[in-house]
């Protein structure tokens, strides 16, 4: 196939768009691959659409290889099924909701577990029909509060979502690992650098869950890994390695002290080190010796706000992502002045476990707050703290919560070493959902014994349109985009940098020969300066660039590798065959 740039619907830009934050966003706009229509909404122009379709085809081929069958469900969905699973409420403001002229409620699909479950239930009724894997490649909709980074986080995006249905847990596990391996093949073919991490299931539900994160400094997801063992997890899924519980016998009694002007951890530590506390004789008091109580209110879907206190060591901040994952599907918010006024037993800056538990406030603590651990914390009165308050003796929390930040150097949950953090972009997520959705819709079939058998289910997603940006993010250089051959809009970009009629005719013949050899060719036949053409070729990012320029008079053309920058001269006679051989690898 030959595409002439003189006819291509394309306009490149010399300057970065003012609202672009990350390299992929800047370059995809500048190179004319996409154009913004509104916040988080983009049009796909010819070059961008070619990349998107090639990624879809890689995904499709690997899904077909594991026996998955492609279908297409509507994006406009009725409220009923999502009400049944409570996700009409759980999704909150993320869901695009609308009504038809008869005031019936609908949504634009963010994901399709409900509809796939109902589809399979409606078609199959016997254990003999299973296992089944169905998938679609379809546009999804989520009302992101802060769309950012171009197509990395938009309100409309293309996703591959597949769903496995089995009659037993062994079948589910097999489907899960089939997808896991297929995803690894997909990302290898796309040239994406990624890591597989343990993850939380969130609103999707289910048990086992893993994310595929593309390594990137602009990623929104923080993950940690242990070099020694290979352990890796999304920060929300990290389980704290708690110390051993300690006996409480023989520990000093807790004592309340006047601590003027100490509403923060820093001022409290400063006071403690000046107070010559007997428990800390011979060592310096640090923030890790203090217990910080963070006050929140939470609300289950459709419920009322309730108070919650979270206790964490004072040297740690509460990580809102971990907190949100631990509380999901409930939402949470920090207390405001009105909340404190309505609950006068909460003394801002001096809250301790006693007032919380005396007043029935649910109190969850970090796993490091083990039985027998001793703390400096608030005494529930202005300018007063208690020293030596012992967990399990002086207070008993209602449970533990994984809400404290995870830091570099923390012990790995597997005990093999320490954790280091990095950032990534979620490109895939796989779930063993189990029977959450099949229970909701009573998706039963007749088992071998003639009795009803509840199906079990897996859900597996890949961000197809996001992968366009991820590849651009990982592969670009200072000159522009650089597409791997598996997804490049064209195999080769032929640039005529010579106004000589013979050179132009020779370039056209070379392009025709490459086309006959089965290559997709972008032919820059425009009446523009060589400098403009070269800059566009580097910006657009085809993996190979052929220059028909000054060397034509000497019977040679130039072949450039866009990734390495290496160039070689090739004899004009028979150039197409030699170039084709190089392109074939």
UniProtKB/Swiss-Prot annotation:
Q: Which Pfam families has this protein been placed in?
A: HGTP_anticodon (PF03129), tRNA-synt_2b (PF00587), tRNA_edit (PF04073)
Which EC class does it fall in?
ligase
Catalytic reaction list = tRNA(Pro) + L-proline + ATP = L-prolyl-tRNA(Pro) + AMP + diphosphate
Per UniProt, which keywords does this protein have? Aminoacyl-tRNA synthetase, ATP-binding, Cytoplasm, Isopeptide bond, Ligase, Nucleotide-binding, Protein biosynthesis, Ubl conjugation
Cellular component, GO annotation = cytosol
Matching entries from PROSITE patterns are given as: AA_TRNA_LIGASE_II (PS50862)
BP-aspect Gene Ontology terms = prolyl-tRNA aminoacylation
GO molecular function, one example?
ATP binding
Domain of life, per lineage: Bacteria
For this chain, the annotated S-S bridges are none
Q: Where in the cell is it found?
A: Cytoplasm
EC number(s) per entry? 6.1.1.15
Enumerate the InterPro entries for this protein.
aa-tRNA-synt_IIb, aa-tRNA-synth_II, aa-tRNA-synth_II/BPL/LPL, Anticodon-bd, Anticodon-bd_dom_sf, Pro-tRNA-ligase_IIa, Pro-tRNA-synth_IIa_bac-type, Pro-tRNA-Synthase_IIa_type1
Cross-linked residues, Isoglutamyl lysine isopeptide (Lys-Gln) (interchain with Q-Cter in protein Pup): 173
Main location (coarse class): cytoplasm
Per the similarity annotation, which family is this? Belongs to the class-II aminoacyl-tRNA synthetase family. ProS type 1 subfamily.
The subunit field of the Swiss-Prot or TrEMBL record says: Homodimer.
**What does the protein in this record do?**
Catalyzes the attachment of proline to tRNA(Pro) in a two-step reaction: proline is first activated by ATP to form Pro-AMP and then transferred to the acceptor end of tRNA(Pro). As ProRS can inadvertently accommodate and process non-cognate amino acids such as alanine and cysteine, to avoid such errors it has two additional distinct editing activities against alanine. One activity is designated as 'pretransfer' editing and involves the tRNA(Pro)-independent hydrolysis of activated Ala-AMP.
According to the UniProt entry, the note on domains is: Consists of three domains: the N-terminal catalytic domain, the editing domain and the C-terminal anticodon-binding domain.
Name listed for the protein in its UniProt record:
Proline--tRNA ligase
> Could you tell me the gene encoding this protein?
proS
